[in-house]
Design a protein with these regions (language model features):
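Substrate-binding/access-modulating region of protease and related hydrolase catalytic domains
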Residues: 269-378, 431-448
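Extracellular adhesion/carbohydrate-binding repeat motifs centered on closely spaced tryptophans
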Residues: 627-696
Length: 696
């Protein structure tokens, strides 16, 4: 499990407060804290959840003191000291300004305090033990606790998704090469994908074997983790559909996922009404960071605002809390993938929103959202944002030029990659449909294609950081960038390109690294660099192949060949750590290595973990060394009819070589005759004296 950090992982809180009217507080008797953005008192007593974000430099002591003060007027919910955020439920109308004053008076600075939603907290989320000092407060708590939501709210974002009928055709898998990728023979390490959604059906035959119930959780009651299976079981169908696209098993049933051997974890992030509130989102990302989740998928926008305004007092705290949690997850090893959204909006330039707030029917108003943030899609420093693609009618998904789905949001600076999102065939809950499969459309369906590819990359590169994984995801998407239609309407949606499952398992593979080639006269001591060396007598040649810990990747097999001698081979485990192969070739007599070539070639071949011939994981390295013939026993000058030669007792005469004799260098041509005068050797002119000694 990842270790928690006390360091706050977000900065710039003071900048967010510019231009905001803050509640005026009386002067304290000691050094005051600095107030942040604070929501106004509510019109009446009603149960509400609040996000409280202290400043980045708040101490552990300040955090605990702030929690204590908040508990005086409410019930403290989830606490995240690792990024200085906590949530509180209170019935008191003046909770936010009252807590703000209390913190400032105590010398505690904060970034923001404000509600997490528009709708009053009701039903199972109401904490009746909270402080109640008036009849108005008591009545508000009782009324809220007695009100229960059944089914989706009228304006829930999940109402956009209705399963379509049709023949099974998971065209998206073909388009990104996932079917071919599944057949590549390569070792895949364990990887876990967290599905932040409406839950997962644990009984689905295509999902249950890949589902890790021990790490699954529900965050939809005040953002407090609950691992009871009833808390994370899908109560819609959206989450089950997303899960199937990512990791439906390869089991001769239904459909395959992009990464069919990945483990999935349900992280239920929506409530029964279909709302994804900030406290749920913070819970989900913190859970991923603390439970060894490698990749997350977020196919939603954070309710109740399509765009959250950083300087709006009713929205700043919820936005800040979620942003901190998402950044915390990334900084703790999690690759976060998110859907761009389905409003045909320019995410580079948000202007008008008519959908928010969406958790109370009829409450939405038209508002200016310039500078607003769609969470999590527009948090590009912490997530990979995915646009949706459509397959033109009658085309082959393996080769077709794909188009932007008409509903997909877009933006040159906000879209990271593109993936199939229109009419995507995947799993549905067993209680929803028989057989439990169907089509859905949306960027919600595109994002899991990208999450599946990210999972494949992590299976191949288990030691990659999120930044490395994302960089490779984008690089490989660029290999098929030309399969995306140029947006003639100016709505740039392509990002780095089309996510590429096949490239994830064939290209940019981890490679073994070949260590220094050395030689020794006794095979045990005094190993010296071999490249371009001049050696004589009896020599050993050695090389060591190191695994990733030294530079890069693992080795499964290696060979070392000296000249035309029989190669020496060895095998490795393919593990990324603790795996090296040492090869020692020899002993060889130097005279026995002499040939017509001017040098001896040494070749090392190292094979990686991928057995597919198309993969780029194997390494071949060659160097040369020279045999210094001047030190060979029996060498002597011989004057032949063709000229002077230098021959040995075994009858061999130096040819096509430079030889140093008694301190002077001579060159002997292919006929073993000593060169004199000007001679062209390998395209270069050299000058030798009449005695044969090299002049330059």
């Amino acid at each position: 499990m990842h270790q928690r950090s006390w360091r706050t992982l977000i900065a710039g809180g003071a900048a967010l407060a510019v231009g905001v009217t803050l509640t005026a507080f009386g002067a304290p008797a000691h050094a005051a804290g600095v107030p942040g953005i604070t929501s106004e008192a509510r019109a009446q007593d009603e149960v509400m959840n609040y996000a409280v974000n202290l400043t980045a430099d708040a101490s552990h002591y300040d955090f605990n003191a702030a929690v204590s003060k908040a508990s005086e007027n409410g019930v403290v919910l989830a606490q995240y000291p690792e990024f200085n955020t906590f949530f509180v439920q209170s019935v008191k109308a003046s909770f936010a300004p009252t807590l703000g004053k209390s913190l400032v008076d105590a010398g505690i600075s904060y970034q923001s305090i404000g509600p997490t939603r528009f709708k009053t907290v009701t039903g199972d989320e109401v904490r009746t033990e909270q402080p109640q000092t008036t009849a108005s407060e008591a009545n508000a708590v009782a009324d809220a606790a007695g009100t229960h939501t059944t089914g989706l709210s009228a304006d829930s974002q999940l109402n956009d998704f209705t399963p379509d009928e049709g023949d099974a055709n998971a065209w998206g898998l073909t388009a990104i090469g996932a079917i071919d990728a599944e057949q590549v023979d390569v070792t895949r390490e364990k990887v876990t994908v967290g599905i932040m959604d409406t839950g997962i059906d644990p009984d689905h035959k295509d999902l249950k074997d890949n589902l890790d119930a021990s790490r699954s959780v529900g965050c939809q009651v005040n953002g407090i983790p609950n691992q009871d299976p009833s808390a994370w079981k899908d109560d819609h169908y959206h989450g089950t559909h997303v899960a199937g696209t990512i990791a439906a098993a390869h089991n001769a049933y239904g459909v395959d996922g992009v990464a069919p051997s990945a483990t999935i974890v349900a992280i239920k992030t929506s409530n029964e009404a279909g709302s994804f509130y900030p406290e749920y989102v913070a819970c989900a990302f913190d859970w991923a960071a603390e439970h060894d989740i490698d990749v997350t998928n977020s196919s939603y926008y954070m309710d109740p605002y399509a765009f959250w305004m950083p300087n709006e007092a009713s929205q700043a705290a919820g936005l800040e809390a979620a942003s901190r949690a998402i950044r915390y997850a990334k900084n703790h090893g999690v690759v976060n993938i998110a859907a761009e959204g389905n409003d045909n909006d320019d995410h580079d330039n948000p202007t008008i929103d008519k959908e928010s707030p969406n958790d109370v029917e009829g409450a939405a108003v038209e508002r200016n959202v310039v500078g607003g943030i769609d969470v999590p899609a527009m948090l590009n420093d912490s997530v990979v944002s995915v646009s949706a693609l459509a397959l033109p009618t009658g085309t082959d998904p393996a080769t077709a030029t794909l188009e932007r789905s008409k509903f997909s949001n877009y933006g040159k600076n906000t879209v990271d990659v593109a993936a199939p999102g229109s009419r995507i065939w995947s799993t549905l809950p067993t209680w929803k449909k028989d057989p439990p499969f169907g089509y859905l459309s949306g960027t919600s369906m595109a994002s899991p294609h990208a999450a599946g590819v990210a999972a494949l990359i992590k299976q191949i590169h288990p030691d990659y950081t999120p930044d490395q994984t994302i960089a490779l995801l984008k690089k490989q998407a660029g290999y098929t960038y030309d399969r995306l239609a140029v947006p003639e309407d100016g709505k740039e949606y392509r990002g780095a390109g089309l996510v590429n499952a096949l490239a994830a398992v064939l290209k940019d593979q981890p490679q073994p690294v070949v260590g220094n080639l050395e030689y020794s006269h006794d095979g045990a001591t005094d190993w010296r660099p071999l490249a371009d060396a001049r050696v004589s007598g009896t020599v050993y040649v050695r090389t060591t192949v190191y695994v990733r810990t030294t530079v890069s990747g693992p080795v499964t097999k290696a060979s070392l060949q000296v000249g035309d001698k029989e190669p020496v081979t060895g095998t490795g485990t393919g593990a990324f750590t603790g795996n090296e192969v040492t090869l020692v070739a020899g002993p060889y007599n130097a005279t026995g290595l002499i040939s017509d070539a001017p040098h001896v070639e040494v070749t090392v071949t190292a094979e990686g973990r991928n057995n597919d011939t198309r993969a780029d994981d194997d390494v071949k390295d060659s160097i040369h060394f020279h045999v210094d013939e001047s030190l060979h026993d029996g060498g002597a000058w011989t004057n032949s009819a063709d000229g002077w030669k230098y021959c040995y007792s075994d009858g061999y005469c130096a040819r096509s070589k430079y030889v140093t004799i008694d301190g002077s260098t001579y060159y002997f041509n292919g006929d073993a005759v000593m060169a004199t005068g000007w001679v062209t050797i390998d395209g270069t002119r050299y000058h030798f004296a009449s005695s044969g000694a090299w002049l330059g």
